[in-house]
Amino acid sequence: MVEPLLSGIVLGLIPITLAGLFVTAYLQYRRGDQLDF
């Protein structure tokens, strides 16, 4: 009963992690344009 729970948690976390990475990369890209990093 543990494996389906873990797989569900992983499958739920992967899209959230990818979305977070895309958002942070986009925000850093926007900031880089404004502040010239």
Curated annotation (Swiss-Prot):
Membrane-spanning ranges: 5-25
Any matching Pfam family: PetG
Main location: plastid
Keywords: Chloroplast, Electron transport, Membrane, Photosynthesis, Plastid, Thylakoid, Transmembrane, Transmembrane helix, Transport
Recorded superkingdom: Eukaryota
Disulphide bridges, residue numbers: none
Known role: Component of the cytochrome b6-f complex, which mediates electron transfer between photosystem II (PSII) and photosystem I (PSI), cyclic electron flow around PSI, and state transitions. PetG is required for either the stability or assembly of the cytochrome b6-f complex.
The name this protein goes by in its record: Cytochrome b6-f complex subunit 5
Organism: Chaetosphaeridium globosum
Lineage of the organism: Eukaryota, Viridiplantae, Streptophyta, Coleochaetophyceae, Coleochaetales
